[in-house]
Amino acid sequence: MDRVLSRADKERLLELLKLPRQLWGDFGRMQQAYKQQSLLLHPDKGGSHALMQELNSLWGTFKTEVYNLRMNLGGTGFQVRRLHADGWNLSTKDTFGDRYYQRFCRMPLTCLVNVKYSSCSCILCLLRKQHRELKDKCDARCLVLGECFCLECYMQWFGTPTRDVLNLYADFIASMPIDWLDLDVHSVYNPKRRSEELRRAATVHYTMTTGHSAMEASTSQGNGMISSESGTPATSRRLRLPSLLSNPTYSVMRSHSYPPTRVLQQIHPHILLEEDEILVLLSPMTAYPRTPPELLYPESDQDQLEPLEEEEEEYMPMEDLYLDILPGEQVPQLIPPPIIPRAGLSPWEGLILRDLQRAHFDPILDASQRMRATHRAALRAHSMQRHLRRLGRTLLLVTFLAALLGICLMLFILIKRSRHF
């Protein structure tokens, strides 16, 4: 956007559109202002023919230059066919219709976090993939808005506050011509389905992330199952401490078996049992050990795994962060009732109850405590290495001082002998 039109032409176009300078590059607002000024400056409406011609010329040049910003980089490698100027009237919101906001960001709370590792097919994640594609294949070290339309480039250009960035960014992309984004519309309409092996498994893990998180990317192949393409976590992991500090995740396990024992029902009294299915919230890291299988799932002749039916990919319900941009759609908020301890629980069951209560009803406190505990573990792990480095520097300094003292002593002896002669 900084190389579109000269400075004088920019100021003249904004003057004709009657927009402030900070809105330069906001295509939606500029296009709306252009339509309003076209009605006022049209000769048939009593406007000036010269001003109308100048406005049309500057506006056409602006759109052509923005279109050429991406083309001048040498292509994106997405093999999306570009249209001519006649096909720029179709905006992104018109392309996806009423479900634009759901397809724009499939899982708002996690798509914003997964910057590098994501296999999601929403518009937000696909534009982020284009950013990496442009840097790798086009050797573009610094990208600005216009060359790339990802969230980071948008925030860097407009300096948008974090609280409202998703709402403003969704409206910004909504009015953008779909042809300028180089998006594969088919992949947005038809996201990648999970593999058949995972569909036939008795227990299927669904993550709140839409793809590979930093923690899943560090999973060792020899230390557990490899994460699937749809973002399914491995059963056992060797976690790297920097990844845990930067990207804690939460998972949801769908267990297709008979309901657990009374302990789990006391912990989660608000969960509705439908047929033989129950949703159990889990946390990847906990201060206490995991619940033993014999406590949650006692041996029973009725515990027979049922075949998993074919499921349709559904989009995640919008959270509070994303409700503001939904046009007139009200989503009921499900507030789980507080956990009430019951008499007759063993110390182990009470320990599990307190852990789940802290993890699920105070996630911010739980995340901060887990991060502090992990940070302390990292410091202890690297303390020996720091001690060895300090010892090496100390030995080197002592050796240097001993050599310097020996040289000084040798010079003193030579000077003393020379005086005797």
From Swiss-Prot:
Chain ranges passing through the membrane: 395-415
PTM sites of type Phosphotyrosine: Y250, Y315, Y322
Keyword check for Phosphoprotein: yes
GO cellular component terms given for this protein: host cell membrane; membrane
Topology Extracellular: residue spans: 416-421
Residue numbers carrying Phosphoserine: S257
Gene3D superfamilies linked: DnaJ domain (1.10.287.110), Small t-antigen, unique domain (1.20.120.1860)
Effect of T160A: Complete loss of transformation ability
Residue stretches of biased makeup (Polar residues): 215-235
Post-translational modification, as annotated: Tyrosine-phosphorylated on three residues 250, 315 and 322, providing docking sites for host Shc1, p85, and Plcg1, respectively.
Cytoplasmic topological intervals: 1-394
Main localization of the protein described in the UniProt heading: host cell
Protein task: Plays a role in transformation by modulating the activities of cellular proteins involved in control of cell proliferation and by acting as a functional homolog of an activated tyrosine kinase-associated growth-factor receptor. Recruits upon association with host Ppp2/PP2A the Src tyrosine kinase components Src, Yes and Fyn, thereby activating their kinase activity. Activation of Shc1, Pclg1 and p85 mediate signal transduction pathways leading to cell cycle progression and cell division. MT also plays a role in regulation of early and late gene expression and in viral DNA replication.
Subunit-structure text: Interacts with host Ppp2/PP2A A and C subunits; this interaction alters Ppp2/PP2A substrate specificity and localization. Interacts with host Src, Yes1, and Fyn. Interacts with host Shc1, Plcg1 and p85; these interactions lead to cell cycle progression. Interacts with host 14-3-3 proteins.
Name recorded for this polypeptide: Middle T antigen
Protein's organism: Murine polyomavirus (strain A2) (MPyV)
